[in-house]
């Protein structure tokens, strides 16, 4: 029999019956998505196939046939007229991914409109305008990507958006969130959201995360934040400041945590209630300011015992403009590294020191090594995360090439990256 993608079919094989929607399939095979959310594939010549719905239309001509089977051509809901206006900008990543049936791998193919169609609950929260900025996995983001994204966000705010949601791959989302935190001072919420598991998987977190992100986008939290699962259950999402968040697990749904700070707050998935735990910038409190410009020739170097200090020479001799060094404990490196650190700062290359511990604060005044590092010109990163310190360095050097001015800016708290008192 003939069938096509989107048809609802019954498949009988060895006395077992399967029902589902036809998905893209290889020649000679049929793949269906069952109600459970799982996919199943069969060799066509080894099964009996019965058509139940013709692309959402039953055999007697009625629509949907009670199965709730929706096709990719389903129209988006008409936006309400009195709801807040939210721009949703898609950059790719797992939240905008699905299975590539050619390879069996996950690929970034969904657009912002696809996300809106797949999560109809969003239409009850706001009027959404979808826009694709890129369709890449987040490991392919770079400083140019951050600037293009920030420009698009500013354009949406200037056009009257009450909030902006950025869908993003989780692996480097903290870098992008930090970058926009430094480039944009915003009067409205800018919310990064992603998912750890693609929409094809029954355990996908994309719908809950997107709904919670929408709640934050219409709130009065006018900062760049990351909204992701707070636990492994579907109970609430956490709201993390863009400069204080880190992905701390490869695959758990609650992989993102605030470091050296409490989260800004939480969003209850069931009620939509937002609770806040720390001070934050409120909607309309600041005027929109946009300062793009990133220096890409900066590097993050991790110190390890016995590491050859001449690794720093590579960056000095190849025209790099700044370095972040991840030291041990309170921010230490081998004494053998200190002459190279001095060589870098003598070359007017700012060097920020952070800690591999992540939690806690840098203090290079306790031990002799730390004091020698300060004498060599090292800048203490305080309780800034290494990744945030790198992005901050890139942004500062994109604003000025004056060494002393840059060093002064790097010692300041510019976007919540340094806390006066480390809370965690």
Curated annotation (Swiss-Prot):
It comes from the Archaea. Pfam families: Asparaginase, Asparaginase_C, GatD_N. The active site is at residues 94, 170-171, 247. Keywords: ATP-binding, Ligase, Nucleotide-binding, Protein biosynthesis. Residues 56-78 are annotated as: Disordered. One of its GO terms (biological process) is amino acid metabolic process. GO terms for molecular function: asparaginase activity; ATP binding; glutaminyl-tRNA synthase (glutamine-hydrolyzing) activity. Its EC number is 6.3.5.-. InterPro entries: AsnA_fam, Asp/glu_Ase-like_sf, Asparaginase/glutaminase-like, Asparaginase/glutaminase_AS1, Asparaginase/glutaminase_AS2, Asparaginase_C, GatD, GatD_N. The keyword Cytoplasm does not apply. It catalyses: L-glutamyl-tRNA(Gln) + L-glutamine + ATP + H2O = L-glutaminyl-tRNA(Gln) + L-glutamate + ADP + phosphate + H(+). Residues 84-413 form the Asparaginase/glutaminase domain. Belongs to the asparaginase 1 family. GatD subfamily. Heterodimer of GatD and GatE. NCBIfam families: asnASE_I, gatD_arch, PRK04183.1. Allows the formation of correctly charged Gln-tRNA(Gln) through the transamidation of misacylated Glu-tRNA(Gln) in organisms which lack glutaminyl-tRNA synthetase. The reaction takes place in the presence of glutamine and ATP through an activated gamma-phospho-Glu-tRNA(Gln). The GatDE system is specific for glutamate and does not act on aspartate. This is Glutamyl-tRNA(Gln) amidotransferase subunit D.
């Amino acid at each position: 029999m003939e069938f096509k993608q989107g048809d609802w079919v019954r498949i009988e094989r060895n006395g077992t019956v399967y029902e589902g929607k036809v998905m893209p399939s290889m020649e000679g095979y049929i793949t269906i998505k069952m109600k459970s959310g799982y996919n199943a594939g069969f060799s066509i010549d080894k099964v009996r196939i019965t058509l139940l719905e013709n692309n959402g239309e039953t055999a007697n001509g009625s629509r949907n046939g009670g199965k709730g089977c929706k096709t990719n051509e389903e129209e988006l809901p008409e936006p309400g007229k009195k709801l807040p206006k939210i721009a949703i900008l898609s950059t790719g990543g797992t939240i905008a991914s699905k299975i590539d049936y050619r390879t069996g791998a996950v690929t970034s193919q969904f657009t912002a409109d696809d996300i809106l169609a797949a999560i109809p609950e969003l239409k009850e929260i706001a009027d959404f305008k979808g826009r694709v900025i890129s369709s890449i996995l987040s490991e392919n983001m770079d400083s140019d990507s951050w600037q293009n994204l920030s420009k698009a966000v500013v354009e949406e705010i200037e056009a009257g958006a009450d909030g902006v949601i950025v869908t993003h791959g989780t692996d480097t989302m903290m870098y992008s969130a930090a970058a926009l935190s430094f480039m944009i001072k915003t009067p409205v919420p800018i919310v990064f959201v992603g998912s750890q598991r693609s929409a094809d998987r029954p355990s996908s977190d994309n719908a809950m995360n997107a709904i919670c992100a929408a709640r934050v986008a219409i709130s009065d939290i006018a900062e760049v934040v990351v909204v992701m699962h707070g636990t492994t259950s579907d109970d609430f999402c956490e709201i993390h400041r863009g400069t204080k968040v880190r992905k701390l697990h490869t695959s758990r749904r609650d992989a993102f945590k605030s470091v050296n700070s409490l989260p800004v707050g939480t969003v209850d998935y069931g009620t939509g209630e937002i609770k806040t735990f720390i001070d934050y910038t409120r909607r309309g409190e600041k005027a929109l300011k946009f300062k793009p410009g990133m220096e890409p020739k900066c590097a993050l170097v991790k110190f390890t015992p016995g590491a050859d200090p001449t690794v720093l020479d590579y960056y000095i001799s190849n025209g790099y403009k700044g370095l972040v060094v991840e030291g041990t404990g309170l921010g230490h490196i081998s004494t053998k590294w200190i002459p190279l650190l001095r060589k870098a700062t003598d070359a007017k290359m700012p060097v920020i020191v952070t800690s591999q511990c992540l939690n806690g604060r840098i203090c290079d005044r306790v031990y002799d090594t730390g004091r020698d590092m300060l004498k060599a010109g090292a800048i203490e990163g305080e309780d800034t995360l290494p990744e945030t310190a790198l992005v901050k360095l890139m942004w500062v050097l994109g604003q000025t090439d004056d060494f002393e001015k840059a060093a002064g800016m790097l010692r300041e708290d510019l976007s919540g990256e340094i806390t006066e008192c480390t809370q965690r």
